C-alpha cells in the first residue's frame, strides 16, 4: 500500500510556493517505517533538497534543507504552518544529522524515539509556537525529496507544444480567404488586461518582451483611443493574418459608450479614434468609414476580465456587459471570455499552469464566472499576461498562444457562417 502524506492540499501548496515551486516526493513516514532517526537518515541520504515535517496536535513544524543531507554543515530553514499563517526562521550552517539528537547546544531538535520536538524559546517566539518546557509532542513525521516541478521531460513537452502552437498560428488563414486579416475586438472592464494581452501576443511572436502599448493602473484606464494592432513574427516583415483591436475599458457610468461598440463592430470606427465616453462617434466624424467592407468589421469579440476581481464588479457594470452579450448573440457575432492574471491565484505553481484547466481553483473560478456572466465553460479562456517581466516564460507563452489559437478559430467560424451575400 502506497504511503500518503498527512499534509493537506492547502498546506502543500503553501510550501510549494514558498520553496520555489517544488514537488514533494514522500520518502519516509514514521508511522509506517518506525519513529527512528536512523531509518529517516538512511532514507534521506543523497536525495538532494529535502524537507522534514512533523505534526503536532495544533500545527505543522518542519525544516527545509536546500542542500540535503550531506557530510557537511548546511543552511537550514525551520518553519511552522498554523491556522494563523506561515512563519519561518533561518538556522545554520549546521549539521542536519545532529538535529536528531538531544544536545544542549541545539536550539531545535527532532527526537523521533521520544515523539517530541525540542524548541528554544527564541525559535518559539520567531515561529509563534507554544511549547511547554520547550517541548512539543508530535504525532507523525514525514520526509520528502523536493523535486523541480517542471522536470526535463515536461520542459521538453512544453517546448514542443510551444513550437507547434507558433507554427499553427503562423500557418493560420482566415476562412475562405474572405479577408486578408481577421479582426478581433478586445472588450472588458477598465484595467482587466486588454492592452497587456496585445503586448503579450506581440512579445511571444517577437521572441522578446515588448511594451509597445502603454499599460498602467489609472482608474479611468490607459487606453483612450481605438487602436488596431497587426502582429509580426520574429524576422518576418509581413504581418500575421490577424489584427487585435484595443479599446477604452467598460465602466459603470464612464468608459466605452455602448453605441461606440456597435460602430466598431460594423467597421465604421477608424484607427486612432479618440473616444468620448459621453458622446459616441457619429457619421459626421471626418474619418468615419461610411461603407465598411467585411475586412473592416470585427470577426470575433473577446471579453477580457481579471480572474481575481470579476466577482467584485458592480451590478450595473455586469448588466451593461450582459446587455452587450445579448446583442452580440442576437446579431450572430461570436465571442469568448479571457480571464487574465491566472498566475496570481493563491497557491498556484508553475506546474499547475501547465494543466491550467484541470487546476481545481481555476475550475472553481470558471464556474463562478459562468454563474455571473453566463458564458459557456468552453468559451472561457485563461492567460497570464506579461506585465512586469523582462524575459519570456515558456509556460506563459503556451497559455497565450493556446488562447489566441481558440480566438482565431472562433473568428473563422464566424466567417464560415456568413451568408453568401455578405
From Swiss-Prot:
* GO biological processes: cellular response to virus; response to bacterium
Q: What is its main location?
A: cytoplasm
Q: Where in the cell is it found?
A: Cytoplasm
Does the record bear Nucleotide-binding in its keywords?
no
List, alphabetically, the GO terms of the cellular component aspect: cytoplasm
Which PROSITE patterns did the record assign? TLDC (PS51886)
Cross-referenced SUPFAM superfamilies: P-loop containing nucleoside triphosphate hydrolases (SSF52540)
- Residue intervals of the TLDc domain: 1-147
Keywords on this record?
Cytoplasm
Protein's job: This protein aggregates to form microtubular structures.
> What family does this belong to?
Belongs to the IFI44 family.
Know the name of this protein? Interferon-induced protein 44
Organism annotation: Mus musculus (Mouse)
